[in-house]
Each structure stands twice: as C-alpha cells, then as structure tokens.
C-alpha cells in the first residue's frame, strides 16, 4: 500500500488479442466461466469495486460476488453529474451487503444528491470541474476504510486512472479471439498521451496459460 494513504488500485479486464473489451455493438462477453470465477474470487479480496457510469448505463451490472463466500464490499460508481437511474441494479440489489457510493463533482446540486441519499446511496463529491477529481477522491475513499479497489472499467475511466498515474496493478485475461472494428471498445480510450515517453510503465509479474487463454499480471514500475 502506498504511503500517501490512497487505495491500492487493481485494473482488471478481459480483452481480445486485438485489445478490445467489447465489440462495436457493445457486447462485452469475453470471459469464460473459469475466468468469471477467478474475477469473483478477486472481488472477495478487495474493499471496493469501481466502475464508470457508462458501464452502469450499458450493462446494468449488480457488481456482486458469486461462487465464493464473502463479507461484501463497496460498489463505487464514478458519475460526475448523477445520471444513473435510481432503479439500477447497483443501487437496488442487496444494498445491505454491497453498499453503493457514487462519486460526483462538487457542483452537483444538493436536490439531486438527496434523491440518491433517500435510496441509501452515499454521495462523495470531488472536483470543481466537469469531471470527478480522482486524485482528490482516492484519499477520501481511503479515509472511510476502502484500502483496495478493483477497477472494472470502462475504457474512459481506465484512461482517467492511467492519465493520473493511479494504477498499482493490472490483471488482464486475453481471449484467443480477434473482433476488429474501429468502433469496438478498447481497453483504454480517452485522448491518450502525445509521446511514447509519457506512457505509464508496468512490470510483468506473472503469465498464466489456460487452454488458449492467457492471464497477464503487472505491477507499476517507477522507472
């Protein structure tokens, strides 16, 4: 864990050989049952799961744990303007086991915040611009006991964490497929860095072969 009291961030994703996490229609079904069980096992080891609002709007996930015993964790949604529906699974499904935090900006109207709070959702505000300030947000999450987070996308949120150099570890499952398409969703999107020298560096720790699937585990490199 870092000394500056930020949660340990693990980016977890499954992608195709050509780096896509979803097809051009948004179909994200890449992981097989074995990988899903491994992902759910990994979820039991963290204090929170984080996704962006687009993941909620497109997939409406429950962000819960199957296959393994557990004590629950926080579901954390980055949603600058509080736009996800109040009947989303991430809000309505088993909130007593998986309490939900939504991270918005400081400009979010109090009236809108109250709509979510009456549905047992805690709102944390960070940043005065159009986007949530992740650098300021993470210490706030640490202070309430969230010391490790599994980041599960989507691509825009992945970029925000990469841009701000907040990723500590990466776990990638690579499926033996090529989906193609300029409109298919890549692992990391956003504006990207202008020069390769700006790219974030990671050190390969482990390679796991399973049938034609490969799991790659990386940790941040400070070199």
Regions inferred by a protein language model and the residue ranges of each:
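Enzymes that bind and transform nitrogen-containing heteroaromatic metabolites
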Residues: 1-223
